[in-house]
């Protein structure tokens, strides 16, 4: 059996001791994600399964629903925004992305179905309830390493990054069909993908904008932008934006700063933040924080300095002790969690002088 530390599924600066969760997986756990309300925990493993636990009073249930649909290790899971119901996506070494919907008693009470009835997404209605496979995306020819749901203001959109070098963008249409855009992102392989906030920093979104297409909004509402970042085996992070003129995603920036594969990329939520923040983690044992002061400004980078966090850090400047596999922002976008190959998770905050400091450290 395999356990996962609950603090790895969400960010906290409290001194409370992390809780170990017995997942009942039979092999290594690769990802653990809480849903929007923190009421469910999804995990995935090399045992080819996804498990979903209910969270009661901060403690996961001892039993889980097990989802079978992959023929290889499952690398990542991602919850859709509750606007679209109880939707969970998973991606695997088998080259598939599976989208699941919970039609059972555990489904969110009052969850809206903006694209129709409970059988939205083309899911068959099931009186027996439980999780249903509503979409199996098989376009990729190699491992799908990362998935990311777009901000809900843009609609039901899922980006998928693959070792075949492509990022596919799945969009659910009002007629129940799925549209696919294929982006040739990194020729030697794509490791991660992350959506940017739907609006530029400091903008406010009207509730009436939900589900609107990207572009200028009427009545003074904020302009919505479809933009995501991809991380590749070419040591590069690329930023893509949907062009209305070309009717496709176009590359708007290529960020060079790492000397080895970029393992993860994460846009920070920009609620109340004055600029755009993007974190990248690499095989070269560094984490870079990229900032952009305005949509037309150049991106600047700052490397985290783990030496201040641990004397055991590597001898090289700004090097972590091992490969950095994951970076994840808090909901407010002001705290960054860094997961390193040495088994440690560190939390970082920017101080008033603009320097990044390690504020917490824990063993995974």
UniProtKB/Swiss-Prot annotation:
Entry keyword annotation includes Magnesium: no
Entry-linked Pfam families: WD40
GO annotation, biological process: COPII-coated vesicle budding; mRNA transport; positive regulation of TOR signaling; protein exit from endoplasmic reticulum; protein import into nucleus
Compositionally biased region (Polar residues): 1-11
Region (Disordered): 1-24
PROSITE patterns per record: WD_REPEATS_2, WD_REPEATS_REGION
Keyword Transmembrane: no
Topology relative to the membrane: Peripheral membrane protein
Localization, UniProt: Cytoplasmic vesicle, COPII-coated vesicle membrane; Endoplasmic reticulum membrane; Nucleus, Nuclear pore complex
Quaternary context: The COPII coat is composed of at least 5 proteins: the SEC23/24 complex, the SEC13/31 complex, and the protein SAR1. Component of the nuclear pore complex (NPC). NPC constitutes the exclusive means of nucleocytoplasmic transport. NPCs allow the passive diffusion of ions and small molecules and the active, nuclear transport receptor-mediated bidirectional transport of macromolecules such as proteins, RNAs, ribonucleoparticles (RNPs), and ribosomal subunits across the nuclear envelope. Due to its 8-fold rotational symmetry, all subunits are present with 8 copies or multiples thereof.
Family: Belongs to the WD repeat SEC13 family.
Protein name: Protein transport protein SEC13
Organism: Mycosarcoma maydis (Corn smut fungus)
Lineage: Eukaryota, Fungi, Dikarya, Basidiomycota, Ustilaginomycotina
Gene: SEC13
